[in-house]
């Protein structure tokens, strides 16, 4: 279907704040979901997308956690439904051909799948899911995404049949949904980052208390940081870990569980990313300074040819006088220090290959040997 609203592309890429997300949700719920809007835009409780975006849900840590949990559950259910996990993709299309309430829902899904913003909607939805999903569960999301083309193909016939409908309401709905998910992703990232760090610090304090009570040194699960040089060693130790050894550890101490490992790894990656971003400009400046010094240390080719010509003409005694150096400064445009350094390095490079110098060294050795024998 055509994108009737001709909404600017930038609107789908920007991220709203918490207040802006609430305004967008209210506008979509009040202006779009009223009257004769399609069934997929109306909910019995009057909420928009079943997401809690009011100020009450974020006024306290418990409210934020409840909102995040409810939103994650709704997002998981949505992905399961759109990816065909809810069952009956073909059944829904068949029911749509026959008519009824299921037919209206199937047609609405077909319109969403055929909308130009569907790919951005799916990407924003999956991005929210990936934030709070454990690392070992991420392949399940990828497996469901692999089925998306099949879902689109199932509803393509219905989308072609509904192409003549007015899509302004759907345009507005899709735009608000994408913007809201982008804003919600930022909130989820902040929520997970803060509470994950608090969880790691709490585990570290528990292990410190255990050490003070029992005298046992803290195990691998401490909150101590590690340098980049120790990452490979830590990864190798993690690969040697046998989960069966945790069977007798009923008190929760000792080696961390798989979920704790996943949480700590996520926090460590987040901190490493923030450090790289914080020092990115300084690292670039240092790199440019090193490259500039390297370029400054190399002399131009025409100047070195002049110095090499003087070297070859004075191969028996390659030590220029002050007058020779002054003349070379005028001819090459180099500084006196650069010329001195070049001759020093050139003599080192050609010390053993210079026949005159090797002959003089042999003569000195023979004379010294004769004096010692006498």
Swiss-Prot record:
CDD domains in UniProt: homeodomain
InterPro entries with a match to the protein in the record: ELK_dom, HD, Homeodomain-like_sf, KN_HD, KNOX1, KNOX2, TALE_homeobox
DNA-binding region: 291-354
Any one GO MF annotation of this record: DNA binding
Cellular-component GO terms for this entry: nucleus
UniProt keyword terms in alphabetical order: DNA-binding, Homeobox, Nucleus, Transcription, Transcription regulation
Residue span, ELK domain: 270-290
PROSITE patterns recorded: ELK (PS51213), HOMEOBOX_1 (PS00027), HOMEOBOX_2 (PS50071)
Expression by tissue: Isoforms 1 and 2 are expressed in roots, stems, shoot meristem, leaf blades, leaf sheaths and flowers. Isoform 3 is expressed in stems, shoot meristem, rachis, leaf blades and leaf sheaths.
GO biological process, any: regulation of DNA-templated transcription
Pfam families from the UniProt entry: ELK, Homeobox_KN, KNOX1, KNOX2
Protein family: Belongs to the TALE/KNOX homeobox family.
Function recorded in the entry: Isoform 3 acts as a transcription activator, but isoforms 1 and 2 do not.
This protein's name: Homeobox protein knotted-1-like 13
Organism: Oryza sativa subsp. japonica
Gene that encodes the chain: OSH45
